[in-house]
Amino acid sequence: IFFQKKIKKIIPTEKISEVQKTLGEKVNSAKVGDLLVLDNIYFKNRSPIIVPTSRAVLYDLLCALEDNPNLKIQIQGHICCQLVSDYEDISTRRARAVYVFLVQNKINRKRLSYKGFGVSKPIHPIPEKTEAEANENRRVEIMIVEN
């Protein structure tokens, strides 16, 4: 049996707006075809379930989409660590989890698409040499389709 300790972290309002502003600025200055890595989105191991600590990043993306009504994106999922194909299609399921979050929060699905790339587009060669490299390969990106 595993127990989880809930830790409440209070983030000052001005810090939250800085994070949102940063993502919003990235989106505003992005051109069609640009890729933006969504840092700090984590999933349960071999699962499309987003861990609760990742919610802040999802809400930042939601705000960026609400602030840019003409913005259309493709959500791209990537996995790490395996040279074999993504047999469980986890990368697609993770990208879809982000898509579902946005649709459930009233973003028009016509503005969104999603795709999984498995291990086909790593940042670092596989197998990774460090956990940091694995974390960078295990990511969600958004590609600007229209802005």
Placement of each model-derived feature along the sequence:
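Periplasmic peptidoglycan-binding/tethering modules of Gram-negative envelope proteins
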Residues: 1-72, 131, 146-147
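Periplasmic OmpA-like peptidoglycan-binding domain that tethers envelope proteins to the cell wall
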Residues: 49, 53, 78-147
